[in-house]
Amino acid sequence: MNHLKLGAAELDRMPAIPDAQMTAEQKKVMDEIAAGPRGRIGGPFIPLMRSPELMNRLQKVGEYLRFQNTVGLRNSEFAVLIVARQWSQPIEWAIHRPIAEKEGVLPATCDAIAEGRRPDNMTDDETLIYNVLEELRNNRSLSDTTYGQLHKRFGEQGVIDLVAHY
């Protein structure tokens, strides 16, 4: 089974390992990831193939953060877009924008984030998440006020689930 979506990764320092050259451990982890909610291997998993145990552990964290977190898929995808823009990560942006829009984030909101502008007409959750992530980026911490708003809306576990994305 070819697990990989090839493209720009072919030009990387650590390109995808062809199936025929994978170790048994690499194949096992690749099969597990491909059978999960992602359905394929791409992005950061390409270089991580060189350390299958680390890749497996990280993908489980990522699977939780993406598919099982307590803030909801729409909110977590919105957060991913903000962070992808803050850190100039076009691959993450390309992967997650369609998911965010499918989950209900407006295209105009995505466009504003892509252009580095604060979106107009955000939902209450989007406004809170945007403020949290901007404050973290700018101050490397949250004020008591912002933390209190985040905690009130999502609880302790939600605070951790959201900030862990960052």
What name fits each language-model region?
Residues 44-48, 58-65, 78-84, 113-114, ...:
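Short alpha-helical scaffolding segments that buttress acidic/His motifs in well-ordered protein cores
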Residues 39, 56-61, 77, 93-95, ...:
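A generic alpha-helix surface/boundary motif
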Residues 1-71:
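Mobile cap/lid helix-loop segments that border enzyme active or cofactor-binding sites
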Residues 97-123:
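Histidine/lysine/aspartate-rich catalytic loop segments that bind and position anionic ligands
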Residues 54-57, 71, 75-103, 107:
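Conserved alpha-helical segments that form or flank metal/cofactor-binding pockets of metalloenzymes
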Residues 23, 155-156:
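Transmembrane-helix boundary/entry motifs in multi-pass membrane transporters
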Residues 119-147, 151:
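Strongly charged, low-complexity linkers/loops
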